[in-house]
């Protein structure tokens, strides 16, 4: 008799435990974070110079069958000068994403940094730079990917792309 009672109690506990785990499986959570920062610098008249910079960071997390976990960051800056002035700008961005679950969950991160430099009138020059970094991670049947970044310059200046992974 005691064995039957113990067996029934064990069976009941097993049933409760399985129902809880199934309930947890159907929970869907989509998490995404984004961070953006931008800085701008104004120029000056005559022989004035202007510069600006910006940066951003983003983080996202998705769990238990959720389809999205992604973070993205972006930053940009610009400056300009009138007359014989110079302008420069730079930006950077970082993104991180993490996805965990069984329903094709995926994590993706993208960091796009755009730096724009405004030029100057007359003999002025413009310069811009940007960098971006992306990281993605997927667990439990999902995959992750990472994005990149870019930069540009204007006003007769130059631009380049920094870190791009």
From Swiss-Prot:
Is Secreted there in the keyword field?
Answer: yes
A Gene Ontology CC term for this entry?
Answer: extracellular region
R repeat boundaries on the chain: 56-62, 93-99, 132-138
Stretches that traverse the bilayer: none
Renumbered to this chain, region (Disordered) spans 105-125, 146-165
* InterPro entries membership: GRP1/2 (IPR040417)
Where does this protein reside within or beyond the cell? Secreted, Cell wall
Q: Give the signal peptide range.
A: 1-23
UniProt-listed GO biological process terms: cell wall organization
The alphabetized UniProt keywords are: Cell wall, Cell wall biogenesis/degradation, Repeat, Secreted, Signal
Give the protein's biological function: Responsible for plasticity of the cell wall.
PANTHER family linked: GLYCINE-RICH CELL WALL STRUCTURAL PROTEIN 2
Q: What is this protein called?
A: Putative glycine-rich cell wall structural protein 1
- Look up and give the organism this protein is from: Oryza sativa subsp. indica
């Amino acid at each position: 008799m005691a064995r039957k009672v113990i067996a029934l109690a064990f069976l009941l506990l097993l049933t409760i435990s399985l129902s809880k785990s199934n309930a947890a499986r159907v929970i869907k959570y989509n998490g995404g974070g984004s961070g953006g920062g931008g800085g701008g610098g104004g120029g000056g008249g005559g022989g004035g110079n202007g510069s600006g910079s910006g940066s951003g960071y983003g983080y996202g997390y998705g769990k238990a069958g959720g389809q999205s976990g992604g973070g993205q960051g972006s930053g940009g800056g610009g400056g300009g000068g009138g007359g014989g002035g110079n302008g420069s700008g730079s930006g950077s961005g970082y993104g991180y994403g993490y996805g965990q679950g069984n329903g094709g969950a995926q994590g993706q991160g993208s960091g796009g940094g755009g730096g724009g430099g405004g030029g100057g009138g007359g003999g002025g020059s413009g310069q811009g730079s940007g960098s971006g970094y992306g990281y993605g991670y997927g667990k439990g049947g999902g995959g992750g990917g990472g994005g990149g970044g870019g930069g540009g310059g204007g006003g007769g200046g130059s631009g380049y792309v920094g870190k791009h992974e």
